[in-house]
Each structure stands twice: as C-alpha cells, then as structure tokens.
Amino acid sequence: MTQVAKKILVTCALPYANGSIHLGHMLEHIQADVWVRYQRMRGHQVNFICADDAHGTPIMLKAQQLGISPEQMITEMSQEHQTDFAGFDISYDNYHSTHSDENRELSELIYTRLKENGFIKNRTISQLFDPEKGMFLPDRFVKGTCPKCKSPDQYGDNCEVCGATYSPTELIEPKSVVSGATPVMRDSEHFFFDLPSFSEMLQAWTRSGALQEQVANKMQEWFESGLQQWDISRDAPYFGFEIPDAPGKYFYVWLDAPIGYMGSFKNLCDKRGDTTSFDEYWKKDSDAELYHFIGKDIVYFHSLFWPAMLEGSGFRKPTNLFVHGYVTVNGAKMSKSRGTFIKASTWLNHFDADSLRYYYTAKLSSRIDDIDLNLEDFVQRVNADIVNKVVNLASRNAGFIGKRFDGVMAAELADPALYKTFTDAATAIGEAWEAREFGKAVREIMALADLANRYVDEQAPWVVAKQEGRDADLQAICSMGINLFRVLMTYLKPVLPTLSERAEAFLNTELTWDAIQQPLLSHKVNTFKALYNRIEMKQVEALVEASKEEVKAAAAPVTGPLADEPIQETITFDDFAKVDLRVALIENAEFVEGSDKLLRLTLDLGGEKRNVFSGIRSAYPDPQVLIGRQTVMVANLAPRKMRFGISEGMVMAAGPGGKDIFLLSPDEGAKPGQQVK
C-alpha cells in the first residue's frame, strides 16, 4: 500500500543565465526528475522547482558584449533553458528567475534579519581592481595559481582541483579575465556574513545524516581549517540587487542565488493563490521535507553558507543535500574541439530524451561519482535494454492478442508464481529509487526483463499459434507476456516518461505503482504500434559533428550593435554636460521635396518651436504616425543650413540605418521642454 503522504520540496541547482544547457547540466535535472516522478507515483505531494541564476558581473559583461540589456539577455536565456528542460521531460512545477520581485524581497528580508541578529559585519578591504576597465573584479573574473595546491589557471573564489575556497587576493600571480591586466589593490567597504558564529550548529547538522558521507567528511576538513567570514557584497557596476541603505553596494550573486529556491516556490504559491504553503514549507519547525540536488562543485556554498543563512534568519534548513559528480564523455572531460561538449538542444535534434534519461539513470548511484557518457556504449545499452528486452517483450505478444483475440487478454494468469516474482520486486526496486541507487534499480528491472523474455522463449507463442486447438494457451501465454511488460514499464515510468505514455496508450490503462498487484485479466488492449526505434552509431557521428559546427559558429567574430559600432572614446562629465537634451513634442512631420531620406519635423519645446530635418524617412514611410509623439532632441546644437532650409537641432534615434531606425521617446509623464539628465 502507499505510504503516508509526505510534503516534499525538491530543487535543482539554478543554471547560470549566460549560457546554454549542456549534457553536464542534464545529469542533475534528470536525476532529480526521476526521483520526483517516483515520489509522485507513491502518492507524495511534491513541489519540484528551479530558476535561472540571473545576477552577477558575467551576465552584465556578456550583455554589454551582445549590445543588449542584462534583462533582455536573461529573459531570452530563461526561455531557452525552459525549452531544453521541457524537451527532456523535466517535470518542474515552476521555473522562475533570481531577478524577480519575490527574490528581491526575500533577499532583503534575510539580509535584514541577519543584520538585526548581529551576523553582518562591515569592514574596509583591499580588493583587486582592473586599472584598464576601471572596475573591481569579482572572484570569477580573476584567475591565477591556487594558494593551496598550486594548480594554475584557477578562479578567484575556489579551486576546481582541490576544492579549496579563498579570497581572490590570495591567488598567486592573478590576472584580470576581463582585460588580461595585472590587477591592483584598492580599498572598499564591504559587508560580511559571520559564518564562524554558526560553526557549532553546522557541525551538528553535518552529523545529523543530512549529508552523504563523502560530503560530511569534506566538511570536517573545512571545520578543521577554520571557517571564515563571508564577503556578501560587491561594488558597482554590478547586475543584481542593491543592498538596502548601501548605495553602490550589491548582494554578491551567491547570497541571492540559493534564496532563489525560496523565490521560485513563493512565485508558485502566488500563482496558485496559496497563502499558507510558503510559510508551511520554510518555517523553522516545518515538517515538510526539503531536498537540494546539486553538483559537487557547489557543495561549500550549500553545506555551509546556505544552512547558516537560513538558521540566522529564522528559516528551516534543508532535509538533505543530494550531491552528484561530473559528466565525462568517452572517458574525458567534455571537449568543444572533439565535439563532445554537447548542448541539450543539439542532443534533441539527434536523439530522443528517454535514451539519455535511461543511460544516465543506469549509471547513477547515491555516491558522488563522476558519470561517463560513452557514446558507443550508450547505443549498445539503449538498444539492448529498452529495445531488445522491454519493448520487444510487448511486440512479441501484442500481435497475437490483437489479431487472434481482438485485443482481449486471458481471464487468468498463465504463471501466477512468475507474476508474483515480478510484483514482489516492487519493494526492492522502490527502495532503490528512494535511496537514489538508480543503477541498482535498473539492474533489478533488467533482470526481471530477462526472466520475462526467457518465459516467452520457452513458451514459444509463435509455435503455439500454428497448433490447432491451442488458442486458449496462446492467449494465456501472450497475456502473461503483456502483463509482465506492464510491470516492467511501471517500474521504469519515472525514467522513461515518453515511452510510458505510449505503453499506457497500448495497454489502455494508466501505469501506477499499486495497480500492478492486480494483473490485467479479460482486459482489452489497443492496437499495438511501434513503441521505440533502435538507435544507430551514425546518429552519434552526426551529433558530434553538429556539436563541432556549433563551436565553429560560436567562435566566429562577434556581430551585433557593439561590434558594428564600438563605443567611442571616454569623455569627461564636463564634456557630456555641454549637451542639452530636451523632451520635444512632434507637432508636424512631412516629406521633404527633393529628398528620399529626410523628414521635416516641427518640434514644440514647451513654448518654443524648432524646425529639424531628420534622415528617418525610410523607417517612417508614413510621417503622420509621428505627429503627437514625444521624442528627445539635442537642443543646443548649432543651426545647420541645408538646401531645404535650416535645421535647428537633432532628434535622437537608434539603429544601424535605413528602415532600422528607431526614434527615442521618453516615458509617459515627461513634458515638452524638460531637460534630459
């Protein structure tokens, strides 16, 4: 029977909103989704959420490079990410963004509570500054040699080789990632979270069973080396949330990123009109369960900073962190040059989602081991397991049931003992899914598939079908095979959602965990259609080649507004102050006889009229649409004599030219003549 229903909140680490989802990301999202789908099958109330991590200097700089706003970039990236996850059947209840009202409010709330409770400290620090770019350098924009293990080319916040965390000022021979310049030291006041105050609590939490043994052991090393106060602020320019009452200071991305779990759940509750669940799940004494699926590279933040922040601000801590390893391809780190750095969208252009879901699941355990995607083994395993063992079991029997018995299965089981063997396995398989011992669960299921196919081989329905007077035997044998297929697909339903839907359509029944205790007897199935196709190595070759081509395309010269029209040389504020920009109302707009480029605009500056010629005719072939609209003009530009008359200023527009010219307009409420500052 189904266990007592639990309330569970599950999250995946938030993908960073400056790049595409790749197969490394997909390991975590598939692992979490399989676990979530199993929990739902067992009747538990699961909320499965995620969001884009949308703040930080990398996003700010990439948006500048693309010539768009950070807001536009993260919006477009969020749509891409959500499309990729949907393509892999990741069953999120909500996918949000850390750049949201919910996240801002919660970040400010947690910060304020930490400050009121004495856990925020202020002090002036010496910080690395890029003298060429005129900006303080975030941790990830400084590279150098790790001060702990001496590994070269490591980022300024943590070492990817030994896992150590440190200040960027501790790096040996640091360099700016932005310009390549050697950074200089500059003083700046920063805000620190007093992590050492939570050392005792964190050590107790570590021993509580909330962490895998490997993670707990690693944390013990960090405790022994001593916890340090954590710098949670960054200086402008920065894309993120400004710290309350601290102009020019912003929350470090790693402060508001995990709060994004809360923000996404709050957004989900608001969408549902649910005013109670947020507090119910996040209050300090909550009996709901909270699980974070994360990669081993971000354990430090999730096992130390995050629970301490929650404790210090009066919220509950995670029930458990489920940490996984990295993905390698063909035994090596994913490589763009070898075509093994594969984007999720590229995969879906060549293979279905179920194939990768199955392969990853078959290799996953509860340990923090790396997973190797061996592409040749992938083809062999998918064909051997899904096609030959599982789908073939249905196809070998369905034809006889459909053609000879009009789709109606036998009234009794041909081999009740064998069926009991299959249903008795539900306990062990369920425990394996629950414990994230996915590989073990798959091995158990495939062992049953072997038993089922052995039964069909021994009973040989294709022989029985030719023997007179054995119709009842044929119906019983094939019905038995289909019933065993149903049990196998029920066990595999968390892994193979698309194949499961097709199986349900054929079986004419929903696959539920408890229903397998009752076999399908005298049940009518639908006409069998091919459930799954074999995959070929030529598809792998095409996938790898496509990935190489994408890398070449990405390496092509950057195009876009900034590339076409680079930013001009720096000017002083005094230079800028000489330009008098004013709001102007377009009273009239008309063609200029003798010119195919110009429009004559009559502008009202709040009592003063101006005549301006503007080369925007191609963009506005009907000048009447401009009448009554407000724009911005340079009001103190010296009058220019033209053969059509005198132009008394210049209106502001953006775009490369021709039809792609866009007249600038102020927000509603601006009045003609007001100065633009």
Curated annotation (Swiss-Prot):
<keyword id="KW-0436">Ligase</keyword>
<dbReference type="InterPro" id="IPR029038">
    <property type="entry name" value="MetRS_Zn"/>
</dbReference>
<comment type="subunit">
    <text>Homodimer.</text>
</comment>
<dbReference type="Pfam" id="PF01588">
    <property type="entry name" value="tRNA_bind"/>
</dbReference>
<feature type="short sequence motif" description="'HIGH' region">
    <location>
        <begin position="15"/>
        <end position="25"/>
    </location>
</feature>
<dbReference type="Pfam" id="PF19303">
    <property type="entry name" value="Anticodon_3"/>
</dbReference>
<dbReference type="InterPro" id="IPR014758">
    <property type="entry name" value="Met-tRNA_synth"/>
</dbReference>
<dbReference type="GO" id="GO:0000049">
    <property type="term" value="F:tRNA binding"/>
</dbReference>
<dbReference type="InterPro" id="IPR012340">
    <property type="entry name" value="NA-bd_OB-fold"/>
</dbReference>
<dbReference type="InterPro" id="IPR001412">
    <property type="entry name" value="aa-tRNA-synth_I_CS"/>
</dbReference>
<feature type="short sequence motif" description="'KMSKS' region">
    <location>
        <begin position="333"/>
        <end position="337"/>
    </location>
</feature>
<dbReference type="InterPro" id="IPR041872">
    <property type="entry name" value="Anticodon_Met"/>
</dbReference>
<dbReference type="InterPro" id="IPR009080">
    <property type="entry name" value="tRNAsynth_Ia_anticodon-bd"/>
</dbReference>
<keyword id="KW-0648">Protein biosynthesis</keyword>
<keyword id="KW-0067">ATP-binding</keyword>
<feature type="binding site">
    <location>
        <position position="146"/>
    </location>
    <ligand>
        <name>Zn(2+)</name>
    </ligand>
</feature>
<dbReference type="GO" id="GO:0006431">
    <property type="term" value="P:methionyl-tRNA aminoacylation"/>
</dbReference>
<dbReference type="InterPro" id="IPR002547">
    <property type="entry name" value="tRNA-bd_dom"/>
</dbReference>
<keyword id="KW-0694">RNA-binding</keyword>
<protein>
    <recommendedName>
        <fullName>Methionine--tRNA ligase</fullName>
        <ecNumber>6.1.1.10</ecNumber>
    </recommendedName>
</protein>
<dbReference type="InterPro" id="IPR033911">
    <property type="entry name" value="MetRS_core"/>
</dbReference>
<dbReference type="GO" id="GO:0005524">
    <property type="term" value="F:ATP binding"/>
</dbReference>
<feature type="binding site">
    <location>
        <position position="159"/>
    </location>
    <ligand>
        <name>Zn(2+)</name>
    </ligand>
</feature>
<feature type="binding site">
    <location>
        <position position="162"/>
    </location>
    <ligand>
        <name>Zn(2+)</name>
    </ligand>
</feature>
<feature type="binding site">
    <location>
        <position position="336"/>
    </location>
    <ligand>
        <name>ATP</name>
    </ligand>
</feature>
<keyword id="KW-0479">Metal-binding</keyword>
<keyword id="KW-0030">Aminoacyl-tRNA synthetase</keyword>
<dbReference type="GO" id="GO:0004825">
    <property type="term" value="F:methionine-tRNA ligase activity"/>
</dbReference>
<comment type="function">
    <text>Is required not only for elongation of protein synthesis but also for the initiation of all mRNA translation through initiator tRNA(fMet) aminoacylation.</text>
</comment>
<dbReference type="GO" id="GO:0005829">
    <property type="term" value="C:cytosol"/>
</dbReference>
<dbReference type="GO" id="GO:0046872">
    <property type="term" value="F:metal ion binding"/>
</dbReference>
<keyword id="KW-0963">Cytoplasm</keyword>
<feature type="binding site">
    <location>
        <position position="149"/>
    </location>
    <ligand>
        <name>Zn(2+)</name>
    </ligand>
</feature>
<comment type="similarity">
    <text>Belongs to the class-I aminoacyl-tRNA synthetase family. MetG type 1 subfamily.</text>
</comment>
<dbReference type="InterPro" id="IPR015413">
    <property type="entry name" value="Methionyl/Leucyl_tRNA_Synth"/>
</dbReference>
<dbReference type="InterPro" id="IPR023458">
    <property type="entry name" value="Met-tRNA_ligase_1"/>
</dbReference>
<keyword id="KW-0547">Nucleotide-binding</keyword>
<keyword id="KW-0862">Zinc</keyword>
<dbReference type="InterPro" id="IPR014729">
    <property type="entry name" value="Rossmann-like_a/b/a_fold"/>
</dbReference>
<dbReference type="Pfam" id="PF09334">
    <property type="entry name" value="tRNA-synt_1g"/>
</dbReference>
<keyword id="KW-0820">tRNA-binding</keyword>
<dbReference type="InterPro" id="IPR004495">
    <property type="entry name" value="Met-tRNA-synth_bsu_C"/>
</dbReference>
